[in-house]
């Protein structure tokens, strides 16, 4: 029996697509190769950081990254080799690091950030239970130059709160005097991504959405301009519409005769317990070393580092040690109790713009990938966009696809 909608991928984007499609009255089946308990979305920092914060590729980032590489504090680590796509990615990254591109991207971030915030509110109204706080993002600066640069962008709209070192310590008690100050971006929020994922899974299962866990899609069958069959290692599944939301795994994208300019960026996190009085009062980002520190219900999580051009899925202890060393330079000594280390791959485009929309060849295939480190930030918005697109029937009929998809961005 042909299924109505098949979503391939059970991360935050896949589940958000399933949620929005279900809300429109569709019968949905989610196929996920793992057991759905520990994917990349679970290891996310949990930031909903769409507001007043620049994308990864922005003016000055190339020189700043080179400087940080000399200190072993760079957010990006490149494993150089004979991979042409890596060099294409780097060139596009450098090309995107200009004021015009950054201004446009930040405007889009705001538009779809609010869409995600609305979606999270709706999830909570639907009875989902997850840690969700709209208490801003604290941008902590360790370089005077970058702190002054950020202050110049602040206005009197209420979206910014400039803090000196003493005031910063009220929000982040463990910082030391090596920091320069901070800016609280008041519109941002944060969640516990694991709780979001589990709540979405439970809600969708109770709503009748079908989940095929531990079932890996290995190929497709094509007929004319349609995908006629989704081939898993267990069976062949037919569907009226297929949403491909497989994150950093390029294998299935290539099966559809596509090769997006996107790299699997390996990121790291450490989740631990610490005394309540020392925990950050809100989500925080050490902006100059690209390290997030996020409070949760019972724990704290730090996330950092993006490695490009590696397939090694094991935790690199050197990277973990480097994260701790970088953090220790700007904090008072404290103990990470019951620490859990994690790594995973994020689908990173060079300009933070995802690949969204109907496939150019196969009329029943929709792509939803490329959010990189912004999955939790924009996942719910992407779900809404993709669901609306499925009704519109064509990319050109959907303004959000035209605005926010890499298919329509130079």
PLM region descriptions:
Residues 287, 331-410:
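C-terminal catalytic lobe of FAD-dependent flavoproteins
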Residues 104-117, 138-149, 183-202, 314-322, ...:
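Short beta-strand to alpha-helix junction loop
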Residues 33, 46-48, 52, 56-95, ...:
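Active-site substrate-recognition segment that forms the wall
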Residues 3-30:
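N-terminal Rossmann-like FAD-binding beta1-loop-alpha1 element of flavoenzymes
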Residues 46-165:
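Dinucleotide-binding Rossmann-like beta1-alpha1 core, especially the glycine-rich loop
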Residues 148-155, 175-233, 237-240:
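Helical element adjacent to the flavin cofactor pocket in flavoenzyme catalytic cores
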Residues 23-43:
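Glycine-rich FAD pyrophosphate-binding loop
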């Amino acid at each position: 029996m042909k299924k109505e909608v098949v979503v391939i991928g059970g991360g935050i984007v896949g589940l958000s697509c399933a949620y929005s499609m279900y809300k429109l009255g569709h019968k949905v089946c989610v196929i996920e190769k793992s057991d759905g308990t520990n994917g990349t979305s679970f290891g996310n920092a949990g930031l909903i950081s769409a507001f007043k914060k620049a994308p990864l590729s922005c003016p000055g980032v190339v020189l700043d990254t080179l400087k940080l590489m000399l200190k072993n504090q760079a957010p990006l680590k490149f494993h150089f080799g004979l991979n042409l796509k890596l060099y294409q990615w780097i060139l596009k990254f450098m090309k995107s690091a200009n004021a015009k591109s950054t201004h446009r991207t930040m405007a889009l971030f705001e538009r779809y950030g609010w869409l995600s915030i609305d979606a999270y509110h709706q999830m909570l109204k639907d009875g989902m239970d997850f840690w969700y706080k709209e208490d801003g993002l604290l941008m902590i600066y360790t370089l005077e130059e970058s702190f002054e640069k950020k202050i110049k962008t602040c206005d009197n709209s209420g979206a910014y709160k400039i803090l000196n070192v003493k005031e910063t310590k009220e929000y982040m008690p463990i910082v030391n005097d090596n920091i320069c100050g901070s800016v609280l971006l008041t519109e941002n929020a944060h969640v516990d991504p694991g709780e979001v994922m589990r709540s979405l899974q439970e809600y969708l299962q109770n709503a009748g959405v079908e989940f095929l866990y531990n079932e890996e899609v290995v190929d497709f069958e094509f007929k004319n301009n349609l995908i006629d069959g989704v081939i898993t290692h267990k069976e062949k599944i037919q569907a009226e519409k297929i949403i491909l939301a497989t994150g950093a795994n390029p294998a299935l994208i290539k099966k559809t005769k596509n090769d997006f300019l996107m790299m699997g960026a390996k990121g790291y996190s450490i989740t631990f317990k610490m005394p309540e009085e020392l925990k950050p009062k809100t989500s925080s980002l050490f902006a100059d070393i690209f390290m997030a520190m996020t409070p949760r219900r019972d724990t704290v999580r730090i996330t950092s580092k993006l490695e490009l051009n590696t397939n090694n899925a094991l935790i690199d202890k050197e990277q973990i040690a480097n994260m701790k060393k970088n953090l220790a330079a700007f904090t008072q000594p404290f103990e990470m109790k019951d620490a859990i280390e994690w790594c995973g791959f994020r689908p990173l485009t060079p300009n933070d713009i995802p690949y969204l929309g109907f496939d150019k060849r196969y009329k029943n295939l929709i792509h939803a990938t490329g959010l990189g480190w912004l999955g939790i930030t924009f996942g719910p918005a992407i779900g809404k966009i993709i669901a609306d697109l499925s009704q519109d029937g064509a990319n050109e009929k959907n303004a959000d696809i035209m605005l926010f998809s890499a298919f329509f961005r130079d």
